[in-house]
């Protein structure tokens, strides 16, 4: 009796402490929890709680009275009432207080959904429950399914304290003794509760989870300011309780539906859940089932609806925020009148019905979600949370077709890793990214047993570009081309009839006549024998591609008549782990490809982008594959890096799981010796390839520092990477989102004062180099002559000579900054018919000097007088860093003020967006043609490789930032200009201290310098031996230090070399060291001006 009296006394004391208020009740409960945490006082504290429960256990009304009077209650929550036998009427004993969520229909439905999982789903797993409230679901889950650990997490600190009390209530019996399960563990071994904003506790403690379950708020608080308060256990009861009903804006697109907190929970879950993990969420159906399911699917989840029912809308939850959302959008939420209503009503109607005393319900579903390709999806979200949160609203990883998902998700993961790891544009050879060529060679070796090296593979933007480039390289008098492959060849080649007497024709005049041929091999062979072409380009019929017989017949007949053979296998190469039989590749597995033959393949067979193409050529003749790589460098610049990455990812997926070199390579028969009468490269190609300074690749032993390239390797701003990534994560991009025409019009108007509206045609190209070379072909079609100022980009001059264009040099001099002087231009134009004048500006490449508005006015006036076409190349402009006294161009005003002009006069504006938009590595060229006849001629050269839809989307976004003068983006451009200015000053200082005479420019990414102190000096090192001059110093520096510059042969200016300085910071510093080291090697410790 004394014990009972003492117990009653303790209960009375506890209740007295609770009487004053909810805060007082919480304080009393917290004091009991401290005793429960301490092993010595734990049994007594548990006995006290048992006595309190028994005091009010007589009826439900007694429990309600306790809640009103003492601001808490302890009662039983009945689980699994339908389970028979010894488990019948299993229950949990739970404490509740006013400031935390009280279990009701919402959470009971969630538990029912969890119940629909098989028992094994949680057994021995690490689980987190989000929004655990008083902990009943975490405890029930641990009690029923025996997980390894359950972490109950809640942002409400009072909820966490009460959850711990409830854990002790159910882990210990009324005598305070532990209750052990069949594995000898108690609930205290399996469950822990922590204060946590969603999964922050697990993230901070690096806990990996097998399962995440959550039943969290999905209505925006009608008082947003209330949600901005800091959550503490001393916050008001009303505020803490609101955390259970409402959520704040989370910065997700789902905020508009009240699902922002769920969205954040899902994305946080992706970072901590194991690859095989499962998330289970309670989803109110108010936004509509499609919206709820899309939240998961667009983040890469497969979903299963475990359970759906209707529940009454809680009367204490204000839905006015949903009414407001309907007012501002076309979306309608879904409610029902009472539980029996089957026709949905909108939030506004539901709100009005509730205000009038009606009762409304909404659907409630429990979804089980599992990531598809979890490791890749995790990489994508790691990238997004690293400063790219704004892109997440565009993310769409929902796919109806698994094959599309299996292709696109790995690519997005690769792209995320690439953008994250490469802060600047990596330096890749024009022949194709080395890694991509390795992957192509690896695929051929692993799947088709052909021992290729990356050098054997040359990458092109498209198959049509590869065919046209090859024909320009050889410039045959007659070529036979498969009728399926002629669609993009120049019309002039297909209409020429210069077949008779071709043996006597001048191989250097560039005339190419193409005859269309049927694909069937017997008919093609008959044509080859009769016409004896110098080049044959063909594909193969499907039935003939199965065996190698047709290919061998083509090899033999082309060898016999002295023809080069380019065989297209685009339709027969399968990017599959089980590719079908291919006769051409079977042949190559056993025999070396003869020197007169090459394989072409256009890659368009992907599951996602039908218009995304990359092509490659395979040759085992060193002279041919080297010449092809140099041809693409001159005529195209390079192939889109992103396109190579896309197909590279496909090849990687096919190779990543294989054990390398598992099978010994079979011996191949050597290639047959080909007779000498085989056509060689055209005379203009031979002389150009010999004289041009091409890209110098590095080796495994030593890397090259490139100060000889027209590319920027400065850090790529996050705004650019975000736009690139968004262009791929989006689905169903509209035409208006990729239409850059108006944006380019605005750019040229703002930058150069040119109005490109009306009849002007804007044509896009992968690079400005490719567009320039189409203009060269237009000039040749008009039988015109290209006029280049002395000091023009050496590759442009070489490209014109490669295709045998007629060229004239306009003299320039250092005193005028290598600008064209009007009088000199006029004197030159007097002696030229049909002139095309090339002007690079406002920034001149490679000198870095600027043309002012008055300069361009005078030049255009002279050109108008002589009826010249003018190609203004703005590709290297937009990065002017010394503009004091310089006046921006006003081309529209200039053109309208011309007093006289010949009818043949017109202006073509050539441009490249990557420099002006700080998007190094992502090229986008454009040309604006105001002359309709010229536009028609341009279109006749239809092999132009155009930017993919994703690039158009990227540059549309970047142009929007620039044209709208976005402050952050404008600051980035200013920073890049300042960086270039600092680099230029440092380079000038280094050059002048090392015996060079620098020509100091005002913009761009390069400058000229004269090796004054080195002229005539004898030098011998690493394979170089001779007297130094401005034309051979490139080779000497390269061999001695690994630094590559352009010599005077490239600049065209006697005595002047070119240094490009938009390098990655570390590379730039190494380059400065190389310049100093070369001075030491040649001049020793001699003091120079500026030293």
Curated annotation (Swiss-Prot):
Subcellular locations according to the entry: Cytoplasm
Enzyme class: transferase
InterPro entries tied to this protein: Aminotransferase_I/II_large (IPR004839), Met_S-MeTrfase (IPR025779), PyrdxlP-dep_Trfase (IPR015424), PyrdxlP-dep_Trfase_major (IPR015421), SAM-dependent_MTases_sf (IPR029063), Small_mtfrase_dom (IPR007848)
PROSITE patterns with a match to the protein in the record: SAM_MT12
GO BP term (any one): biosynthetic process
Cytoplasm listed as a keyword: yes
EC number of this enzyme: 2.1.1.12
Main localization (coarse): cytoplasm
Superkingdom per UniProt: Eukaryota
GO MF entries: methionine S-methyltransferase activity; pyridoxal phosphate binding
Keyword vocabulary terms for this entry: Cytoplasm, Methyltransferase, S-adenosyl-L-methionine, Transferase
Catalytic activity: L-methionine + S-adenosyl-L-methionine = S-methyl-L-methionine + S-adenosyl-L-homocysteine
PANTHER family: METHIONINE S-METHYLTRANSFERASE (PTHR47087:SF1)
Self-association state and partner proteins as the record states: Homotetramer.
Protein family membership: Belongs to the class I-like SAM-binding methyltransferase superfamily.
Role summary: Catalyzes the S-methylmethionine (SMM) biosynthesis from adenosyl-L-homocysteine (AdoMet) and methionine. SMM biosynthesis (by MMT1) and degradation (by HMT-1, HMT-2 and HMT-3) constitute the SMM cycle in plants, which is probably required to achieve short term control of AdoMet level. Also able to catalyze the selenium-methylmethionine (SeMM) from AdoMet and selenium-methionine (SeMet). May play a role in phoem sulfur transport; such function is however not essential.
Name listed for the protein in its UniProt record: Methionine S-methyltransferase
Organism lineage string: Eukaryota, Viridiplantae, Streptophyta, Embryophyta, Tracheophyta
